[in-house]
């Protein structure tokens, strides 16, 4: 008898269609390399949206003819001269563009954040940023003097950030009300490009600072860390199986120790409620534990020839 496969019913497919489509859109959104796309298409796309929105508003306003009701009242009344479906469609499309502008601004400024957690430190530690907040934790052996802090860092998408600069809500509202004024339109575009220029310069400043910090850490590792940790050592084996008078000493080729790491877990950090149990620090393994250092069988080491020396008692 063949394998029975339970197929999804048509009702379940119809019910799950919206959430499945939403998950598919989210996966496609995450699969896009936005760093490459933003450098090439963000500014042309934003300018195209501005141009289309401006043309729609000009067409909608040009279909209104202001006339005066009489000589007594100077109020003006707009009479629609074109009630076609095309004008209604353009009005709906311009409202959608305005809604997208507000939605993009709110999403790129409020919901694009990354969370980082610090090691347990003193509760009285003062922070220089308001984005650092203490994290509630459950710990059986909590001494009450240490606290884990969480840092929320703004990490905007570059494509959405450029789009927010060139098609911000203020920019869209100005084009909505003053689309027929050439002077106001040019000043609006000038202001948007000025904002984009400052944002790009500030992003470049952050990249330069990150590069400078990496170079400082690299220089520190090269000058202080590596010379003290990666010290060249040699293995020495002493054979005393025939007595102390006939002991022999064998020297091996000097080499650097193999770096291995151990997971170090903090008791207060393991009991956090919002994250699973993950290692928060790595501790360098002592070079005396040679039986765990992963020495290959063909390496120049005495433990390949003398297995009883694997306890590390004869290492010098």
Curated annotation (Swiss-Prot):
Location in or out of the cell: Endoplasmic reticulum membrane
Record keywords: Endoplasmic reticulum, Meiosis, Membrane, Transmembrane, Transmembrane helix
Membrane-traversing stretches: 41-61, 88-108, 159-179, 186-206
Membrane topology, record value: Multi-pass membrane protein
GO BP annotations, alphabetical order: heterochromatin organization; maintenance of rDNA; meiotic cell cycle; regulation of exit from mitosis
A Pfam family it matches: DUF2418
Chain residue ranges for the region called Disordered: 291-316
Stored InterPro entries: Nur1/Mug154 (IPR018819)
GO cellular component, one term: endoplasmic reticulum
Biological role stated in the UniProt entry: Has a role in meiosis.
Protein name stated in the entry: Meiotically up-regulated gene 154 protein
Gene source species: Schizosaccharomyces pombe (strain 972 / ATCC 24843)
Lineage of the species this protein comes from: Eukaryota, Fungi, Dikarya, Ascomycota, Taphrinomycotina
């Amino acid at each position: 008898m063949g394998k029975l496969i339970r197929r999804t019913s048509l009702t379940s497919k119809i019910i799950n269609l919206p959430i499945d489509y939403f998950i598919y859109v989210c996966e496609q959104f995450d699969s896009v390399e936005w760093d490459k796309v933003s450098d090439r298409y963000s500014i042309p796309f934003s300018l195209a949206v501005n141009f289309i929105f401006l043309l729609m508003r000009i067409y909608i306003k040009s279909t209104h003819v202001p006339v005066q009701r009489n000589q007594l009242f100077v109020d003006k009344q707009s009479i629609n001269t074109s009630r076609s479906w095309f004008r209604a469609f353009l009005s709906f499309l311009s409202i959608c563009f305005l809604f997208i502008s507000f939605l993009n601004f709110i999403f790129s400024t409020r919901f694009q954040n990354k969370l980082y957690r610090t090691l347990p430190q003193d509760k009285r530690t003062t922070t220089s940023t308001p984005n650092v907040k203490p994290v509630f934790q459950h710990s059986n052996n909590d001494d009450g003097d240490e606290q884990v802090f969480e840092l929320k860092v703004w990490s905007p998408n570059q494509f959405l950030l450029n789009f927010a600069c060139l098609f911000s809500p203020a920019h869209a509202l100005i084009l909505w009300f003053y689309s027929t004024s050439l002077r106001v339109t040019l000043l609006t575009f000038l202001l948007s490009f000025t904002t984009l220029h400052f944002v790009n310069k500030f992003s470049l400043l952050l990249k330069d600072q990150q590069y400078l910090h990496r170079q400082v850490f690299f220089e520190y590792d090269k000058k202080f860390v590596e010379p003290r940790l990666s010290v060249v050592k040699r293995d020495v084996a002493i054979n005393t199986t025939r007595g102390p008078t006939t002991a022999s000493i064998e020297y091996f080729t000097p080499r650097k120790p193999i770096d291995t790491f151990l997971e170090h877990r903090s008791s207060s950090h393991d009991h956090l409620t919002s994250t699973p149990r993950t290692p928060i620090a790595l501790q360098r393994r002592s070079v005396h534990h040679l039986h765990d250092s992963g020495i290959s069988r063909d390496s120049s080491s005495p433990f390949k020839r003398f297995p009883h020396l694997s306890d590390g008692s004869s290492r010098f």
